[in-house]
């Protein structure tokens, strides 16, 4: 039976054969007639398929729109977060390296009844404040836990010793004295809490922070916006709004009444500028003595002398009284040794210009005694005066110890010839002294004068010293004619010599005089 053209178009043969023929021609055109045939032949399927496609498209549109809104919201949130980060207040701990060194060992803070300052002190740098707003910067110290600790020496560490109750102590906070201040001023400076004091006196009325000994605490920093309705100086607690709190792990410490860890003690002495006295070598005599023995000194100084006369009875071994111009006994009477035959020189430290600092010898209390007597002429006897407190006639500074020296009673400017009775280079009255009977004690005073033993006439004798020096030793040269005269006098059994006004010229002195400490 023949089919009409319209019926043949919708026949199975046409449907199966026509796509195969057109497959080679145009694959893109294949779907369009197929879809049309499906739409016309299967109406039920077309009705079912069309709503599903329509439903898929709105879903895709909704997803695209939702994704756009998500991206826009995320962009807005990121921008808000960036703005918040710029406006968020940040606090940076200053001196964190030093705090970490203490924290690694175990920081300890001394607390006393009167109050003790912290070292290291809390110092911070603030960022992110509103330059126009007013802020309070406050410090308080809170317990780390509710434990009480004890220090174990054999293991050098802190151990828990029991529980404790901190509710019995009213918490206190320290308001920085610059508060309130604008954010611009706070951000421009380093905020230091070096005036904070810690105390264990629960009845303290000076505003110190009250803590308990052998407990662990951690300081906190609070940045509070100023509120005209609240006066922080009159309240005992923080407001609930507008407060930013900061704390640092390395600032934790244990309260003690005396340092337990020796490493903490050494570190605080080394780094604390107020512990200078503990670093002073004068506190350790052994360290100072070792330093003095090894440190080379090359000082050059000049000396002026002032004379005192001692009268000794020939052949007697008693004490040698010291007399003044009026014949009254001198206050040095009880200080002289019975057999002090050579003259001596007392040198206060202020009279010669040492080049080394006074601090090196300020704690040495032993006076120095130097004998500068020629051993081939006179027998040298030790003679040491006590500390300056027993010499009221001398004004002696306390920075350096006294110095005693023995010198021969000779002069290069005036010497009496015992045979002729004449003297050489002598102008004016002369000082005469006997080797066996008289001794002369020279006390160095301000540049000026020495007393004549008989008439108490004032003379000035200057002894410039330019020797090769060492610690505790001095080499002093002497004119050759003085040695010749001294030896000549000793051979003839007389020692009448004179001093006149003038000074000794050291440029022609070459033999050395023995000296000892």
From Swiss-Prot:
Keyword line: DNA-binding, Nucleus, Transcription, Transcription regulation
Biased composition (Low complexity): 74-83, 314-333
Annotation: DNA-binding region: 93-280
Location in or out of the cell: Nucleus
Region spans: Disordered: 1-83, 312-333
BP term (GO), one: positive regulation of DNA-templated transcription
One cellular component (GO) term of this entry: nucleus
Basic and acidic residues bias: start-end ranges: 46-66
Listed InterPro entries: p53-like_TF_DNA-bd_sf, T-box_DNA-bd, T-box_sf, TF_T-box, TF_T-box_CS
Gene3D superfamilies: Transcription factor, T-box (2.60.40.820)
Entries under SMART domains matching the protein: TBOX (SM00425)
Compositionally biased intervals (Acidic residues): 35-45
Pfam hit, one: T-box
One MF term in the entry's GO annotations: DNA-binding transcription factor activity
Function: Probable transcriptional regulator involved in developmental processes. This is major determinant crucial to palatogenesis.
Protein name according to UniProt: T-box transcription factor TBX22
Organism whose genome encodes this protein: Mus musculus (Mouse)
Organismal lineage: Eukaryota, Metazoa, Chordata, Craniata, Vertebrata
